[in-house]
Amino acid sequence: MANHRIDRVGMEIKREVNAILQKKVRDPRVEGVTITEVQMLGDLSAAKVYYTVMSDLASDNQKAQLGLEKATGTIKRELGKNLTMYKIPDLIFEKDNSIAYGNKIDQLLRALDKKS
């Protein structure tokens, strides 16, 4: 049952952070950033927030990471307003490489299909 609550809190934080990034954060470095997943620690003290950026450029990814780190305080404050939790978890932003990995596998499968 506790695991179900952790998953629900993670989904709610994902939804709220996406909304906050679109509506409240005015930093141009975080434009085009989408939250793909949130993994919560068991005690809900921290949340690892995975994100993707529309651009494939390494400089844009680095700028997005810096922009998210800079906006962490604003995001936590807005989460505190919108969520009914005793303590808002610390947010740790990490780039989600699963989409790029999936695209690479797709390209390899297409290349194999063309050869046969």
Swiss-Prot record:
Its main location: cytoplasm. PROSITE patterns: RBFA. Keywords: Cytoplasm, Ribosome biogenesis. It is found in: Cytoplasm. One of its GO terms (molecular function) is ribosomal small subunit binding. One of its GO terms (biological process) is maturation of SSU-rRNA. Pfam families: RBFA (PF02033). GO terms for cellular component: cytosol. One of several proteins that assist in the late maturation steps of the functional core of the 30S ribosomal subunit. Associates with free 30S ribosomal subunits (but not with 30S subunits that are part of 70S ribosomes or polysomes). Required for efficient processing of 16S rRNA. May interact with the 5'-terminal helix region of 16S rRNA. NCBIfam families: rbfA (TIGR00082). Monomer. Binds 30S ribosomal subunits, but not 50S ribosomal subunits or 70S ribosomes. Belongs to the RbfA family. This is Ribosome-binding factor A. It comes from Streptococcus uberis (strain ATCC BAA-854 / 0140J).
